[in-house]
Amino acid sequence: LSTSLRTRQTWEGLSFSWGKKKPKVEFQRALYLAAWPALLAVVKTAPEKTQSLMLIGHNPGIEQLAFALALKPKTPPERTRLEAMAAKYPTAALAVLDFDGAWKDAAAGAFQLTEFIKPKDIPGYDGEDD
């Protein structure tokens, strides 16, 4: 997670769903306003035993990373999700990407975009997209 106040607040808003079994969290100053290649470098350093990885960062870097990783959609639904990301990637959007390789081999176009969720897609959300 970026060390910024906003990303910490985002994490606090999400972390309750894990209850007492919260995942390990690392705050990294390097994620603050990082460009997508720097974010990809962080992904590549994840330990191999890591099954899931969540980055909470800032636009434009986090948005550009999602685009770079999902660059080659393989199915019509994935293409539709990529088009939705291209139309608008608002603050607090979530891109879920699947990757079958070793983290150290993570590369642009190697991931599948399995979900793209904007805040307004969540039932009960009454705010505005940034």
Residue ranges and their predicted role:
Residues 70-112, 116-119:
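Domain-level recognition of soluble alpha/beta enzyme cores
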Residues 50-72:
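A glycine-rich beta-strand to alpha-helix segment
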Residues 30-32, 118-121:
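Residues that form or immediately flank small-molecule/cofactor binding pockets and catalytic motifs
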Residues 121-130:
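Extended, histidine- and acidic-residue-enriched regions that form the cofactor-binding/catalytic faces
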